[in-house]
Amino acid sequence: MALNYESVDFIKVLGERRSCRFYDPERAVEVEKIQAICQAARNASHMGNANCITVTQVTKQETKDEFTKIVSAFNIPMAKMAPVSLVFALDRDKWYNGLPVGLPILFKQGGVNPSHGWSMDNIENSTLPRLTTFPPEVVSYLLSCETGMAMASAQLMATALGLGSCCYAGQGPKIAEVLGFPDSAQFVWAMAIGYPGESVESMGWRERSPYGDIIFAEKFGTPAIADPAVDQELT
């Protein structure tokens, strides 16, 4: 079935995204919307085109019953209420085995190019030998960052489709066991998805640190200057 949605301004999506913790448990999320959210994650930036991020869809009640026993206690009500949980994981084997495939393809398609110093000789004799000998803990760090980018894309797609979302944690090794992860896969975070049981207004606007406290100009600690009129567009 084709995706049925109304086009939403991207600035509006950024401004209205909230962490939603109350869902309508009686309203199922359409499969095509789940697919669109997962496609947004799939299409996010992937280092070396290695495609190391996985998303496991948890929708069946029996899986949810097992899964919700091993998430953080304060997240259990939300995980039970949400019709869907997407479980994001990184897979180190996909790094070690995927880079030798994905990076040459990226070069041939012009994603990395000679004007920046890339060549097949450089890829095969320098870049790949270096990247594919990174220790697992370094690969996990890099792929955790990559997973975050995929999750951000998924959250924005969910918001654009009129759905709520909220990331939550759990017992990684037990989650891996319940969902059948291979040893190379590592749980990063789960994301509740569903039709909101609360409005954007009731969720409120979360206060953030002042712009200049975390956004710097040229050097760490030198506050960047924000234009209030720009901020107003996002609130």
Stretches found by the model and what they are:
Residues M1-T235:
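Acidic, surface-exposed loops and disordered segments
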